[in-house]
């Protein structure tokens, strides 16, 4: 299966946390355009604002496993090397405090304007 096929599948079957965050992002609460399940290099990122070079990742439970932590750190560094800022949230953070998550994203976007 090709990367673009995986991205399309991920769009069709988002996690509850991804779905909730997308509902808020899509409603333009952040005043910038985001894409979801977007391919950057060899990666599919959950959300990206190309204009601001900001990637948002929403991590499920398996991201706390040692091997996955190492992969995530490498991936984050690779994205940073390409000029992107990366914010990671746990599923439970998005589901339990969507206002707090949106505020962190807004703060990051505002810092990019300075």
Listing of model-derived features with the role each one plays in the protein:
Residues 36-38:
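Short acidic-hydrophobic surface loop/beta-edge motif
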């Amino acid at each position: 299966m090709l990367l673009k096929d995986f991205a399309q599948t991920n769009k069709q079957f988002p996690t509850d946390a991804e779905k909730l965050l997308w509902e808020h992002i899509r409603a333009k609460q952040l005043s910038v355009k985001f894409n979801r399940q977007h391919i950057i290099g060899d990666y599919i990122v959950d959300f990206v604002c190309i204009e601001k070079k900001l990637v948002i990742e929403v991590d499920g439970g398996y991201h706390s496993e040692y091997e996955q932590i190492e992969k995530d750190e490498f991936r984050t560094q690779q994205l940073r090397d390409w000029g992107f800022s990366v914010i990671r949230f746990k599923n439970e953070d998005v589901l339990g405090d969507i206002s707090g998550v949106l505020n962190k994203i807004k703060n990051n976007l505002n810092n990019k304007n300075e």
